Amino acid sequence: NRDRMVEMREKCSNTPEDSVMERTRQLCEEKQRTEELLHRMLPKTVARKLTQGIGVEPETFEQCTIYFSDIVGFTSMCSESTPLQVVNFLNELYSKFDEIIQGFDVYKVETIGDAYMVVSGLPERTPAHAGNIASLAIELLAAVNNFRISHRPNDTLQLRIGMHTGPVVAGVVGLAMPR
C-alpha cells in the first residue's frame, strides 16, 4: 500500500502545466533542429523566408557564374570498386570540397554522383561572381592534385571543370526535398 501511495503522489505532482511545459520545450527543440537542417540545405536568405512562412518566388539574376565538375574515369572506377568504396571515396572528396568552398562567396547547389555544382552571384548578388568561381576552380584543382583515393592509391584523380557566366533564374523547386 505504501508503494501505491508513493506512486499516486508522484502522479499528482506532475501537474498538467508541467506536462504542457515539457511538450512545449520538446516542440521548440524540434523546431530548432528543423530550421538548422533547412539552413544547411538552402541559402540563408531562402531558408529564413521559408521558416517565416514567406513564399519564395523564382527570381532572375542577370549575372551569375556556375561551376560544374565531374571526375574523369568515374564510371570505370565504379565498375572496378565496391559500392562502399565508391561512397567512401565520394564522401572523402566532397567533404574536402565542402571545406574549401567555405572560404569563397559561393553556394553549393548540389552533388549528384560525381557531379558537383556551385554558383556565385546568387542568392546574394556580387560583381565578383566570375572571379569567385575561377579562384574556387583553381583551389579545387590543387586539392585534387594532392588527393589520394584510399582504395586505389596508384590512380591519379582528374577533374573535368566547366564554368558559365550569364543570366540565371533561381527558385525553390519541390516540397519533399526542396532544391
Question: Whereabouts are the PLM-identified features?
Answer:
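Residues at helix-coil transition
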Residues: 42, 142-145
